[in-house]
C-alpha cells in the first residue's frame, strides 16, 4: 500500500534507511512519497538514495531539499517562507543563489579527507538563515559580505577541537570566523517548533565582529553593523533597562513586580554575549520577549525591520523557562561585566 506523507506536519522527523526501507519518525515504509506542495511529491526511493549518499543526518525537510531542490521544502528551517507570496519566494531564491555564488561568504567543511565544499543543504541552511534574518534590511547582508566572513563546519567533535574549536560553537573575532560542528546546524530542527540554534547565536557574535571591522574598532563592542541613530538609541535603552533589572537580582533586591531579566546570567558576562544571547532569543521566542522585555524586542524589531511573530505562531520556551528557573531558585547571579552602552547603577 502506497503511503503519502505531508511535509508540513512531518518536516522535523528523523530519517533512517535500512534494508531498502525508510523509517521516518517511528514508522517504516517500503513504498510511497512525501508531498512537498499541492502539485509536487518526492518518492521514498529518491529519499533512500539521497540518504545513502549524504555525509550527515538531518530531519526529513533537509533530506527532501537535498534531493528535490524545492524551496518550499525549507519552510521548517526558514518559516519566513510560509508568509511570502510567489514573487517574494522567487526573490528569496534569487538572493540565496547570489550568496551561494559569492566568494566573500566562505563556507568550508572539514572531514577526514580534508577541507571541502559542504553539501548544498549545509550551505543553504547557513545562508538561508542569514537571508531570513535580514529580509527587511538586505543592505546588512551586503555589509556582512564586505567584511569577508567565514563559516567553518566540522564533520565531528574531533576535527572541531583539533582546529581550535571550544564549547558548542564559537566565533573568532580577529579571524571573523564561526566554527561549528556540522550536526549542530540541524540540532534544533528535530521538533515541530525549532528550538536551540547555535548558528544564530554565533551569527550574533559575527554581527558584532562585522561592526568592529566596518567601524575600524580595536575590539568588539556588542553592537550590530549599520545601526542607525534610532537603532543605537533603542539598543542603549534596552540594554540599560536589562542591566538595571539584572543588578537588582544580583544584589538580592528583585523588583517588587517580580520582573526578571529574560537572559541567563551567562549573557551578562560581556557585551558580546549580551548581544548574541538576546539575538538568538529574538528569533526563537519573540512572543515571550515582546511581552516580558518589550524594550529589547523593539530594539531588534526596529533594527531588522521585521517581526518574527508574523511567521512563528509559538515560541520555543526552553531558554526562557530555564532562565526563569535560575532567578527563582535563589542562586546568586554572576557579576555583570558589561562595559558599553550602559551606565553604572
Which residues make up each language-model segment?
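Active-site recognition of the HExxH zinc-binding catalytic motif
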Residues: 194-211, 276
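Post-HExxH zinc-binding segment in Zn-dependent metallohydrolases
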Residues: 210-267, 272-273, 279-287
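A short secondary-structure junction signal
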Residues: 162-165, 182, 189-194, 208-211, ...
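Short, hydrophobic/amphipathic alpha-helical patches that form generic packing surfaces
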Residues: 79, 98, 123-136, 273-284
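Auxiliary, metal-adjacent structural segments of Zn-dependent hydrolase domains
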Residues: 93, 101-179, 187-191, 306, ...
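Non-catalytic architectural context of zinc metalloproteases
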Residues: 5-116, 249
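Pan-zinc metallopeptidase signature
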Residues: 254-345
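Structural motif
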Residues: 86-87, 114-121, 265-273
Amino acid at each position: 500500500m502506497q503511503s503519502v506523507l505531508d511535509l508540513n506536519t512531518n518536516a522535523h522527523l528523523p530519517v533512517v534507511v535500512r534494508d531498502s526501507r525508510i523509517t521516518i519518525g517511528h514508522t517504516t515504509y517500503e513504498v510511497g512519497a512525501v508531498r512537498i506542495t499541492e502539485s509536487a511529491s518526492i518518492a521514498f526511493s529518491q529519499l533512500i538514495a539521497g540518504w545513502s549518499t549524504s555525509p550527515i543526518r538531518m530531519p526529513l525537510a533537509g533530506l527532501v531539499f537535498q534531493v528535490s531542490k524545492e524551496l518550499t521544502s525549507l519552510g521548517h528551517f526558514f518559516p519566513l517562507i510560509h508568509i511570502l507570496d510567489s514573487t517574494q519566494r522567487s526573490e528569496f531564491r534569487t538572493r540565496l543563489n547570489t550568496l551561494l555564488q559569492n566568494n566573500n561568504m566562505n563556507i568550508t567543511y572539514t572531514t577526514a579527507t580534508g577541507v571541502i565544499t559542504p553539501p548544498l543543504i549545509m550551505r543553504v541552511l547557513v545562508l538561508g538563515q542569514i537571508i531570513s534574518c535580514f529580509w527587511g534590511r538586505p543592505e546588512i547582508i551586503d555589509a556582512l559580505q564586505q567584511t569577508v566572513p567565514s563559516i567553518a563546519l566540522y564533520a565531528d567533535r574531533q576535527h572541531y577541537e583539533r582546529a581550535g574549536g571550544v564549547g558548542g560553537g564559537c566565533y573568532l573575532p580577529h579571524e571573523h570566523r564561526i566554527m561549528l560542528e556540522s550536526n549542530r546546524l540541524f540540532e534544533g530542527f528535530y521538533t515541530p517548533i525549532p528550538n536551540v540554534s547555535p548558528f544564530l547565536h554565533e551569527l550574533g557574535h559575527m554581527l558584532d565582529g562585522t561592526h568592529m571591522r566596518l567601524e575600524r574598532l580595536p575590539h568588539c563592542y556588542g553592537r550590530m553593523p549599520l545601526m542607525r541613530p534610532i537603532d543605537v538609541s533603542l539598543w542603549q535603552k534596552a540594554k540599560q533597562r536589562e542591566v538595571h533589572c539584572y543588578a537588582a537580582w544580583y544584589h538580592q533586591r528583585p523588583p517588587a513586580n517580580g520582573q526578571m531579566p529574560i537572559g541567563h546570567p551567562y549573557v551578562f558576562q560581556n557585551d558580546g554575549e549580551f548581544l548574541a544571547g538576546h539575538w538568538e532569543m529574538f528569533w526563537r521566542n519573540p512572543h515571550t520577549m515582546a511581552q516580558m522585555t518589550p524594550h529589547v524586542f523593539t530594539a531588534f524589531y526596529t533594527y531588522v525591520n521585521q517581526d518574527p511573530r508574523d511567521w512563528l505562531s509559538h515560541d520555543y520556551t526552553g531558554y526562557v523557562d530555564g532562565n526563569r528557573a535560575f532567578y527563582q531558585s535563589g542562586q546568586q547571579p554572576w557579576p555583570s561585566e558589561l562595559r558599553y552602552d550602559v551606565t553604572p547603577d
